Amino acid sequence: MRRLPRSVQLVCVLGLLAGPAQAQDGDLDQFRAHFDQAMSALAAEDTTGYTKALEQAYPFLPARHLNRPFVQYHLARAYAMTGDSLSAARWLSQMLHDRIEGLMLYYTAYDGAFDPVRSSKSFKDVMRQVDTLDVTATHLQGNVYLLEGAGCQIAAQVGPDGVLLVDAGYSLAAPAVLRALGGITKAPIRYVINTHYHEDHVGGNATLGAAAAVMAHPKTREALLEPQTFIEGVVVPPHTGHSLPTLLVENPVSIEFNGETVHVFPLPGHTEGDLVVRFEGSDVLHMGDRYFALASPYIWPGKQVDAYVATMDSLLATLTPDTKVIAGHGPVTPAASLNASYQATLELIDFVRMAVSAAKTVEQTRAMGKARGFPEPWVAGIYEALTEE
């Protein structure tokens, strides 16, 4: 069984909890300390300690931090374990209200922690709120629209050939995605491109890709054929049927659709099978979860650092000052913001590379990096990647 690493469970926590820019209205060190206590209590089956530590951790996260819904989910399940349906429903409702990634409540269907409250009126009322979910459609430029509210940022390229989607959101959001598209066009969906295998990006495949070609990296299809662990004890069954990609992309490819060239680049790092999509004529780039806009000053390069640098150099060379960059989560940014994050990442990579060349240990490199203001988890991760290449 393939398990999501801790970094994925916390929405790429390595990137989001590093650096001073994220802590302007919160204290992430305090958050980490209390959250680790909560996980230790959970492992010890101490429900009271689990709940208390989560309540202590939550206020230290900034208001729009991408990890807030993850902590809200844990708080809901902690109260559900004690049979407190009102408190569990309150935290699930807060997830939906915040609209960061409220549809993470999808996982409650597979989480036995919610069994004590599943039949309660308050829990059912929250789940019914999903039926009224709105996905908004905003025209970006050219043929491309941004669909928000489905669990991830979806790009929709629309024209006479039909609709091409980049990512599909959670399955719970698929009806709302179709309603949003219906306000733009009556054309059918012809392509769905999955940037990677995580449920918030592929859950809508079965509905949105029912009459379309679903494109993804072979590693994404491999992952979808296996059960996926969200958190300990919460396992999503394998995908089947229309949920599975049928067009597999292992090398850069281009397709002509709606009068423009659409380039698809493999860029592993967040997972083993990440894809990014460049709409040449519309001048839009969708980075999936390879870029968390404004959440971190860096971009995680992954284990294949040299391949990452080569691909990013080629990709950035195609961008213009007017390029709009869609991240898997967070705001649309100009190309300059993506480039700034990339240049900061190159500086970090070069620092670690020099330390490795000088035969420094990982502990020495972490200490040197800390003195330079580099986040220690990033230094250690890049050190490991470079020494394994």
Sequence positions of predicted segments:
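Accessory terminal helices/loops
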Residues: M81, G112, P116-D131, L316-K324, ...
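Active-site HxH/HxHxD metal-binding segment of metal-dependent hydrolases
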Residues: R179-S254
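Metallo-beta-lactamase
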Residues: G162-V163, G169-L172, S254, T261-F351
